[in-house]
UniProtKB/Swiss-Prot annotation:
UniProt xrefs under SUPFAM superfamilies: Thiamin diphosphate-binding fold (THDP-binding)
EC number: 4.1.2.-
One Pfam family cited in the UniProt record for this chain: XFP_C
Family designation: Belongs to the XFP family.
Keywords: Lyase, Thiamine pyrophosphate
Protein name per Swiss-Prot or TrEMBL: Probable phosphoketolase
SS bond partners: none
Cofactor: thiamine diphosphate
Record-level GO BP terms: carbohydrate metabolic process
Organism from which the protein derives: Rhodopirellula baltica (strain DSM 10527 / NCIMB 13988 / SH1)
């Protein structure tokens, strides 16, 4: 068993300074939770000095203050480039207090000055209407991770250090957070880190023993088991355990010196000798009481060191005078008169513990990654165009075409190493195999003879954990780089809530002038619902789009290009954009190609448009509008149009294709939305619209419910019918196929009369023929497999 480190070479005077800094941060943290006035306790505390609504989380806060104070010492001593990630981000008082003490907070918010008046404002704003949230939110300098939803701190930290060889991320992992699936998996991220070209993550597992009302698992297994667990993950654990402050200061100082020494030794060896074999990186296990230095007992019940200290220990001072008395005793226990001068400023000899300038963790430019953002070098997407010999000519698969474009983005940006591709073992499966012409999968575990495209250095990161891919990419973007997440459409749902949190982050940071814009989070969703016939029902779910459009209109964008040239145009736009979440849904299987590159670029720029060549309308309104959004819905719509034009030649048809889904919303609801007049010009004011949609049909109704002609919009899409079957049968099961679309049009056009009814009967016969054929032959009918668009239609 590893002994707790207690001896240290750090001077006793320095340890006393660290203790004073820690006490100052604790004082400011308690003040944020409780005080609305009397910030320096220049008079006895009165109930009028206490906030009427007490919010916040004390339990994790003193431990994080302890860590931050010690990191300040080691940053300054070793001139480290370091940022801080608060996994248990509900300890927001700690991050705010420390950035205030180091001065970075007041530089961004000058009205929160480093004096008594500023301190009062600091206290009042915390968890207060019109103030700041209780977590390590975007409003807090130095934060790249809010820590509200637990589990992503290590993933974000590793994303931050990829291609940042001089950066160290001190990542505090809460022992409650450590029970989440994403965090438990994230320990394996060390198998992807290259010590020669990447930075380092220093995890600090904070064992304070409790969650809201339960003990934590890692705090209740024995020392040896915990040590073996961390070693099994590939880490070298350094234990700091106890509750006596001065002994703990000594132990923590030595632990950090050992850890930083090991990191530097690992990196120096890799960079000087070329040895990139996987090292055992250090990590620290800090075991300290929950609610450390807070009230020992509250109302006769033990508080410090128990789950009772998780939030606000003394929660009712208005009704309980003893609580008010304890709050004052608690605040005065930090001896603020020793820490702050009469004006409320941290005494200089204590303030000198912290680094200065950009070395302060609250001012480090990596924590405001837009400051470091360098635009990608982009090839001309037009150079990858698919030549259109005729409308609907067969392509090789849209993502396979785009893979060559992305390959060259990798190549062009190799010098600056600021672009990466992330995916859960699906980069080849999703059609992006061309990228491996110029790069490898970065991998630092064992490599055996038959492995392909694995190397210690590469621009592709693949781990069969959507959580890690998403977290790595977010950390990479937040620190000023660019990336792409490719994923099966159905399984991107695994990161629904991670997307939610990132979209919230972008929303808030877009409202903070000091936060620079970062590159957009780009999803490429391939292997989609309509071509998962071979994997079955579990792999068929287009509902991520429903999740995405819930977020703020200023943040989210959704694109469904109908062919390869459109996909190239869309990807070029998305990879150049900043501060959005872009979701692109595209197919990987051979499919018809509709538009020349010039047409595709113009169509995608508009986001929606009439395909004149597909319809046959005259200058007046058509009899029916056939609309489509998505590659397979476009195919089925055009096949339906060809049937209608052949059998009902007098019927006038307009074909509308949608690439940018948000064009369907009113302009008042989304920046990309069409005005009512423009929408009516496309979809008419009173004609029936048969709309073939890639995802769940009610999403279109939701986006168009305010439109003049909404009552006449009839949407077909995925309605949760699926199995292992043929590609075309997937559309039949969901009434999205060409035969159903033809019948949908006829049902709403009584003027087609007997000819229409005979055509409807033919379509019903075709559906029976289809079912019989696939049941006998196991594949689609030749007229489906070999269908081609004809200009004569």
């Amino acid at each position: 068993m590893i002994e707790t480190l207690e001896s240290t070479q750090v001077s006793h005077e320095t340890l006393r300074t660290i203790d004073a800094y820690w006490r100052a941060a604790n004082y400011l943290s308690v003040g944020q939770i409780y005080l609305s006035d009397n910030p320096l306790l220049k008079r006895p505390l009165r109930i009028e000095d206490v906030k009427k609504m007490l919010l916040g989380h004390w339990g994790t806060t003193p431990g994080q203050n302890f860590i931050y104070a010690h990191l300040n010492r080691t940053i300054k001593q070793n001139d480290l480039n370091m940022i801080y990630v608060s996994g248990p981000g509900h300890g927001g008082p700690a991050v705010v207090a420390n950035t205030y003490l180091e001065g970075s907070y007041s530089e961004i918010y000058p009205h929160i000055s480093q004096d008594e008046a500023g301190m009062r404002k600091l206290f009042v704003q915390f968890s207060f209407p019109g103030g700041i949230p209780s977590h390590a939110s975007p409003e807090c300098p130095g934060s790249i991770h809010e820590g509200g939803e637990l589990g992503y701190s290590l993933s974000h930290s590793f994303g931050a250090v990829f291609d940042n060889p001089d950066l160290i991320v001190a990542c505090v992992v809460g022992d409650g957070e450590a029970e989440t699936g994403p965090l438990a998996t994230a320990w394996h991220s060390n198998k992807f880190l290259n010590p020669a070209t990447d930075g380092a993550v220093l995890p600090i597992l904070h064992l304070n023993g409790f969650k809201i009302a339960n003990p934590t698992i890692l705090a209740r297994i024995n020392h040896e088991e915990l040590e073996q667990l961390m070693r099994g993950y590939g880490w070298t654990p350094i234990f700091v355990e106890g509750k006596d402050p001065m002994k703990m200061h000594a132990a923590m100082a030595e632990a950090l010196d050992v850890a930083i020494g090991q990191i530097r030794s690992i990196q120096q060896n890799a960079r000087e000798t070329g040895d990139t074999s996987r090292p055992r990186w250090p990590m620290i296990v800090l075991r300290s009481p929950k609610g450390w230095t807070g009230p020992k007992f509250v109302d006769g019940v033990r508080n410090e060191g128990t789950f009772h200290s998780h939030q606000v220990p003394l929660s009712d001072p208005a009704k309980c005078p003893e609580h008010l008395k304890q709050i004052e005793q608690w605040l005065r226990s930090y001896r603020p008169e020793e820490l702050l001068d009469e004006n409320g400023r941290l005494r200089q000899e204590i303030a000198d513990l912290a680094p200065t300038g950009d070395r302060r963790m609250g001012a480090n430019p990596h924590a405001n990654g837009g400051r470091l953002l360098r635009r990608l070098k982009m090839p001309d997407f037009r150079d990858y165009a698919v030549e259109i010999s005729q409308r609907g000519c067969r392509g090789i698969g849209d993502t396979h075409v785009t893979g060559k474009f992305i390959r060259d983005i990798v190549r062009l940006n190799e010098e600056h190493k600021n672009f990466r591709i992330f995916g859960p073992d699906e980069t080849i499966s999703n059609g992006l195999e061309a990228v491996f012409d110029v790069t490898q999968r970065q991998w630092n575990a064992a490599i055996v003879e038959d492995d392909e495209s694995l190397a210690p250095t590469g621009r592709v990161l693949e781990m069969l954990s959507e959580h890690q891919c998403e977290g790595w990419l977010e950390g990479y973007l937040l620190t000023g780089r660019h990336g792409l997440f490719n994923c099966y459409e159905a399984f991107v749902h695994i990161v629904d809530s991670m997307f939610n949190q990132h979209a919230k982050w972008l929303k808030v940071t877009s409202e903070l002038p000091w936060r620079h814009k970062i590159a957009s989070l780009n999803y490429l969703l391939a292997s989609h619902v309509w071509r998962q016939d071979h994997n079955g029902f579990t792999h068929q779910d287009p509902g991520f789009l429903d999740v995405v459009v819930n977020k703020k209109a200023e943040i989210v964008r959704v694109y469904l290009p109908p062919d390869a040239n459109c996909l190239l145009s869309v990807m070029d736009h998305c990879l150049r954009s900043q501060h959005y979440v872009n979701v692109v849904v595209a197919g990987k299987h051979p499919s018809p190609q509709w538009l020349t590159m010039g047409e595709a670029a113009e169509h995608c720029a508009k986001g929606i448009g009439i395909w004149d060549w597909a319809g046959n309308e005259s200058s007046s309104d058509p009899d029916v509008v056939m609309a489509c959004c998505g590659d397979v819905p476009t195919l089925e719509t055009l096949a339906a149009v060809s049937i209608l034009r052949e059998h009902l030649p007098d019927l006038t048809i307009r074909v509308v294709n949608v690439v940018d889904l948000m064009r369907l919303q009113p302009k008042s609801e989304h920046p990309h939305g069409l005005s009512d007049s423009d929408f009516d010009a496309l979809f008419t004011k009173n004609k029936h619209v048969i709309f073939a949609f890639h995802a769940y049909p009610w999403l279109v109704h939701r986006l168009t419910y305010r439109r003049t002609n909404h009552a006449n919009i009839h949407v077909r899409g995925y309605k949760e019918e699926g199995t292992i079957t043929t590609p075309f049968d997937m559309t039949v099961l969901n009434d999205l196929d060409r035969f159903h679309l033809v019948m949908d049009a006829i049902d709403r056009l009584p003027e087609t009369g007997g000819r229409g009814q005979r055509l409807k009967a033919l379509m019903q016969e075709k559906l029976v023929e289809h079912r019989r054929y696939i049941n006998e032959n196991g594949q689609d009918m030749p007229e489906i497999r070999d269908w081609e668009w004809s200009a004569r239609s």
